């Protein structure tokens, strides 16, 4: 309804002026609203500071007395209230920016409107001028008419009458023209005034709607803060109720208690007798004034203790420690003690000093005659199992060096050489595994591909360890980099053929090739690849022959694992088909692995992300920004069908934040740490967030789909870090999982690696082809896919297998594995084919799986920005890997 077009007319035509001045009041009201919100933000900020001061007052409460634990409840509640009001201050400041921005836009709109309604202003002025001339013309016409009538009544001459009539006609014509001008100006004014009134009303409606939206944001922010304050008060009341009087008394008694033993009654006779005996002992044990040098040990120094190399008696069994040292007991403790030659009553000598203990070094036994290879291997295994490797090639062992200088016989050199060889093999084997998980040999340990149940996304095998942003690469915080060995193509060590291999493909025994097979360790580490009867040397057109094994590698397998005193590096997480494993297990990395990495410079170039960085030291009371690190880890699950380009894809992600160990002292001290706030940007694709309810706060009223703001509960974060510090006090950094998220991605460009499979199953021949292609548009930044493996299950007896290119056969799991080079935009597609002759009828198609990882980007493109001061981002790590990545025919 046009209110302005109906209510702003009138005789004096002041409606336009009223409307124009009303519109000009819009920027003024906007500025006044900004001033009001700014004053409210100042009040909230002052209140937040007052609550922080109150929290500090509560934290400085006396730790004595039974009421002391309740001060912590007050402190936590005050911190949360201060945080709520501080967050409201931040929201109001953002709202002020929006109001001021709207005020600037309003000024531009008014300037444009003024140019549009200037014609209406001219029409108003013209109508006003015509309205002023019209009464004058009418008055002139009336006067001329009255003069003509007066002359007619006076019977004046005809000449005078003609003059009067002429003047009357001129006045009438002037009045007629004035009326016409007025009507024309009135029509023009009415039309332009109506248009301007409608324009002013539309502007006012837009202005009021925008102002109402700003007021709604203001009210919503205040309401959310009040809801949070209510939750804080409810939590405070619940905490007060949970802390019972009995609990306070028990805590005080346990922490400040002085003991449970009560003083017993005393008997005078027993007490006096005990005092008399004690006095006699003191008198007998009292020594006269003793001058230095009068002691027998000082006057007659004993000869130095000689090292006894004699064999012990056959009838005695001396105590021998684990390193071959025999400790002779102190002679003062023997049952047949030497009779004292001196009086202990008035002796000036210190005869009660403890005697020196004697160390008997067990000599090296005589070499045994030559024995059988089995016995020699067993003895070598027992000897190598007790060895302890030094920390590095340049390290020293002070205990043994001093004893070697004293004449300890040297151990045989063959055992350390063999053990170091085995250690090098195991170290290379450990670093040769996938950086984020084992190969695909363990991807389908419990999967049944014959049914359709294996095609559902019911599990998410994780090749990453979510407990650290860097897994094994990075501790997350600002210190010099140290290269760590990574996976290398030439570090896969083949294993000899297993007894389950077919007779035609079984590898010849080691003895047949002149290689003596040493005994295997009790718990050998699983090898990275198991060629078995189908080795890497498979050629198209012929039967597969076993790959020749390296004799040095075989000898290295004989040595059992060693206990290393070197720095421990976190090893990748083992994949499983159950829930994601979140534990990070340590793995020894010996000096041999480091030397191997130095011998192959390509290690470092291939593992640019495998860099270990030590944590930054955080000095207590430092005024610098505290360093933190974050990691985005995502897992893509995809299911393809035949040659169809579309697929079902789902991505799950996790945000982990890493804190240095020294930050725990800063968080636990005074003043309290600043609130850690951050903003996730580019979150449009994310469908669901699951924040850590104990640590993370968020604003549910945020309407921008591109961003998501969070801030941490500093009290809960401090408590969580303290728990980790208590559980692992030697850790250099601590990881906290803050939130998880997930989203679905339709379309052929939704996954980084497109797969298609085709099976041709006949009675005498089975042919399988797998095609793959790189999709750079699936990631935020195109990055190569590393550790790419394609797995083809073959669950039936077959013969005459042909592969293009060569693949690895796992006999136990009955599957083929193609290990591909890094897949990127350059040469990012290929075709794999396999054919065989089934021995038990036509083959049954099975889903083909893929595994890969990528560093430096994510599929979602989400990023993190710190909000506020007090913290700095040391590192942001981004990576993704496969979960269930399948293609069926």
UniProtKB/Swiss-Prot annotation:
Coiled coil spans: 156-195
Known function: Functions in an early step of clathrin-mediated endocytosis. Has both a membrane binding/bending activity and the ability to recruit proteins essential to the formation of functional clathrin-coated pits. May regulate Bmp signaling by regulating clathrin-mediated endocytosis of Bmp receptors. Involved in the regulation of T-cell poliferation and activation. Affects TCR clustering upon receptor triggering and modulates its internalisation, playing a role in TCR-dependent T-cell activation.
Positions with biased composition (Pro residues): 496-511
Pfam families (alphabetical): GMIP-like_FCH, muHD
Entry keyword Membrane: yes
SMART domains per UniProt: FCH
Boundaries of every F-BAR domain copy: 1-248
Annotated segments matching region Mediates interaction with AGFG1, CALM, DAB2, EPS15, EPS15R, ITSN1 and clathrin: 609-889
PANTHER family membership: F-BAR DOMAIN ONLY PROTEIN 1, PROLINE-SERINE-THREONINE PHOSPHATASE INTERACTING PROTEIN 1
Tissues/organs with expression: Predominantly expressed in lymphoid cells.
Assembly mode: May oligomerize and form homotetramer. Interacts with AP2A2 and AP2B1; 2 subunits of the adaptor protein complex AP-2. Interacts with DAB2. Interacts with clathrin (CLTC or CLTCL1). Interacts with EPS15, EPS15R and ITSN1. Interacts with AGFG1 and CALM. May interact with ACVR1; linking this receptor to clathrin-mediated endocytosis.
Similarity section: Belongs to the FCHO family.
GO terms of biological process kind: clathrin coat assembly; clathrin-dependent endocytosis; positive regulation of T cell activation; T cell receptor signaling pathway
Region described as Mediates membrane-binding: spans on this chain: 1-275
Superkingdom of the source species: Eukaryota
Domain MHD: 625-888
Gene name per UniProt: FCHO1
Protein name: F-BAR domain only protein 1
Bilayer topology annotation: Peripheral membrane protein
Disease: Immunodeficiency 76: An autosomal recessive immunologic disorder characterized by onset of recurrent bacterial, viral, and fungal infections in early childhood. Affected individuals have T-cell lymphopenia and variable B-cell or immunoglobulin abnormalities. Some patients develop B-cell lymphoma, others manifest neurologic features.
